[in-house]
């Protein structure tokens, strides 16, 4: 009986901490929007006037990126770095995760189940944690190998959208990944398509992982009072591969002149695509992983 009680307590404790990608922290962040200098006075020209970019242009780029992924992206690996502000306004630490992902566009018929493997690298409190989820695996449950001498003795199975798994998270594991990021951006952008208070800039020459990318900045001049409201959003696009590599959004400063507070940041570094991931990459029995054998 004592053994069962101890195991039960361990599972509850593990569940509470398992999906907390970001550890609560009262420390601030030095993150700030990229300062981009844009000329307001274009030189005189006999040619046609160049229209400033707008949300429609951003939506077109995002739609093109989604189409490119549907055609060319079967799977990928990356060093995923995320940072989020929780529901009470506390900005968590940056969390670094090694990610392996299979998109829904793989296979001969361009249709495959979505699968994800995560291994946490930092912060130290979660280093070594592993998570596997697949829409066709384990009855939709999330397999978790927690860190620690006691908590790491047993694989924990969680509902990905349940209260324990969502503790401290903005999105469930099923919403992680390049494809979902683009789809979410399109969904948000459509809400601002006809918003006159939104200003857009698109700048070449932004370096991300030693790759020349485009930096898109979307600025709101007044709050929208929507659930996903922001003052500034930044999107980094790799134009060669038509992939969105990074997204950050900032809230509204408390007073004029203050830096806007970071709300969320997601970046995919060292991205490798179409490397041939198999079902073994999303199997708790994979000997390269640390999942317990029971």
Where do the PLM segments sit?
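Gly/Pro-enriched, hydrophobic low-complexity segments
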Residues: 2-6, 19-30, 119-124, 132, ...
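N-terminal mature ectodomain segment of secretory-pathway/periplasmic proteins
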Residues: 56-151
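Hydrophobic transmembrane signal anchors and adjacent membrane-proximal interface regions, especially
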Residues: 24, 36, 50-55, 71, ...
């Amino acid at each position: 009986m004592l053994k069962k009680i101890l195991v039960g307590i361990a599972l509850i404790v593990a569940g509470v901490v398992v999906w907390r990608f970001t550890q609560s922290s009262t420390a601030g962040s030095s993150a700030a929007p990229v300062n981009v200098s844009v000329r307001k006075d274009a030189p005189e020209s006999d040619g046609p006037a160049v229209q400033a970019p707008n949300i429609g242009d951003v939506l077109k780029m995002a739609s093109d990126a989604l189409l490119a992924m549907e055609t060319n992206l079967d799977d990928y690996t990356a060093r995923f770095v995320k940072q989020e502000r929780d529901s009470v306004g506390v900005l968590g630490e940056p969390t670094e995760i090694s990610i392996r992902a299979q998109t829904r566009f793989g296979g001969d018929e361009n249709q495959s189940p979505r699968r994800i493997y995560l291994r946490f690298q930092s912060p130290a409190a979660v280093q070594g944690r592993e998570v596997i989820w697949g829409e066709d695996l384990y009855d939709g449950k999330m397999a978790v190998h927690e860190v620690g001498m006691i908590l790491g003795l047993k694989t924990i199975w969680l509902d990905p959208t349940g209260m324990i798994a969502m503790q401290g998270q903005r999105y469930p594991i099923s919403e992680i990944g390049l494809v979902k990021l683009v789809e979410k951006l399109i969904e948000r952008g459509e809400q601002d398509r006809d918003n006159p208070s939104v200003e857009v800039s698109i700048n070449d020459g932004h370096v991300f992982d030693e790759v020349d990318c485009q930096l898109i900045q979307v600025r709101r001049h007044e709050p929208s009072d929507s659930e996903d409201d922001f003052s500034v959003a930044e999107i980094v696009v790799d134009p060669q591969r038509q992939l969105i590599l990074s997204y950050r959004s900032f809230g509204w400063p408390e007073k004029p002149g203050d830096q806007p507070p970071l709300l969320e940041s997601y970046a995919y570094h060292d991205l490798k695509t179409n490397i041939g991931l198999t079902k073994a990459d999303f199997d708790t029995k994979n000997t390269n992983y640390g999942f317990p054998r029971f």
